[in-house]
UniProtKB/Swiss-Prot annotation:
An annotated Gene Ontology molecular function: ubiquitin-like protein ligase binding
Function, in words: Substrate adapter for ufmylation, the covalent attachment of the ubiquitin-like modifier ufm-1 to substrate proteins.
Domain of life: Eukaryota
Chief location: endoplasmic reticulum
Protein name according to UniProt: DDRGK domain-containing protein 1
Start and end residues of each stretch annotated as Disordered: 101-178
Entry keywords, A to Z: Endoplasmic reticulum, Membrane, Transmembrane, Transmembrane helix, Ubl conjugation pathway
Organismal lineage: Eukaryota, Metazoa, Ecdysozoa, Nematoda, Chromadorea
Basic and acidic residues composition bias: residue spans: 118-178
Protein topology in the membrane: Single-pass membrane protein
Localization per record: Endoplasmic reticulum membrane
Keyword flag Cytoplasm: no
One Pfam family hit: DDRGK
Amino acid sequence: MDPLLLGSVGVLVLAVTLIIWRLLKLQWDEKAARQRTDMLLAMNEGAGGSDERRGANVAGGMRRNARRRVNRDEQEDGFVNHMMNDGEDVEDLDGGAEQFEYDEDGKKIGKRKAAKLQAKEEKRQMREYEVREREERKRREEEREKKRDEERAKEEADEKAEEERLRKEREEKERKEHEEYLAMKASFAIEEEGTDAIEGEEAENLIRDFVDYVKTNKVVNIDELSSHFGLKSEDAVNRLQHFIEEGLVQGVMDDRGKFIYISDEEFAAVAKFINQRGRVSIHEIAEQSNRLIRLETPSAAE
């Protein structure tokens, strides 16, 4: 869970608890003030009854007591009215000083007003906190959106770069294939005395026939190959080497003047054997190759 969210919930719960405590304390203070007021009123009534009894016995003392009672009643009534108007600013039953609180300017204020000001301040702080929280969430969301935009832009740039790279590779491959094609055609441009060079479709047919002959016979004698296509042995070897380099055929030339064609499947079988065995000797490779590579033409094998 988000730590900031947990902190927000904690602050909110603390603020609500503080407000409830303030309200309960205010009710308790008001109840205590009413009780003290009732007690003072009862004391005032008892004092008045005593003065009246003394006034009935002594006429001269009655007037003096009446005047004192009036003055005392006025003072006590003023004190009671003051307590009724402001329940916070009252004396304790034991004669203690009145309870006050002070605002930010140092002025004395009653507890009820102080509680209201405190609640108002807490609400203001809570609103400010909520505003800051919304602004912070908005800022984080904007940052995440900006990061997503940057990532999308980077992905698009990478895709374009990859497409451009593939396009260049494709163009380069097509160019090389075309050059190889032209080179192969040139290799079969057989010139004879009194005749023109063989070009076009006829040269392509000669290339195809040459490659098919090697693949079909599997083990090709160079002399037979040169005789079959009307070439010198050296030219036949050169052209065979050229086709090997171009990837049209693949195989090995032995020291007896024979070329052994190896198919893709046979190459894969030998590579699989090496990968499975791990470290192998040349003798083991040669022995396994003799078993995996077919040295007979399909017709001879049948």
